[in-house]
């Protein structure tokens, strides 16, 4: 169980590092009363190898995407979109980050969308919904360090998340090629969704020594 917790926390933190980009944009919007000047420059500085794109969606409509090239189809009305509308409205109405996916990106890669709702205050001190700051995380790139270590140490693993905030059904985000026999798991929450990380040695659980030894490398 310790080993699942150790890796599970690492994976959670790797995903959180991507989500921090939406928080950074959110703070700029709040401080600048809903405006971001030089969005492309800011987004470029926030990008990393595990990020597919950074987006702004005032009133829930995606208007700005970095990088713009190849992402023109991403400019959609999230609130009224048949695949994204319900979960986007949930994020807006419940003041919570949502993660949706994985879904196929261009070149056959996969991604997870993180939508972070932003609220501003009008002249009457009334809060209103500005829109979303968004980042598309590449899968499995966002947790590549963890899965590289897992593979090196001879583990099979599975990362999954609930399909939506109101669902108990888990959807696989990424998994190793082999089967999982009697896996131990670690559950964690990101935004409004529950995530689960499962792990088992490729050779099976012989004894507790293996768990203790491998855990020691990451404490």
Label the model's feature ranges.
Residues 17, 21-23, 63, 194-202:
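Solvent-exposed, well-ordered amphipathic alpha-helical segments
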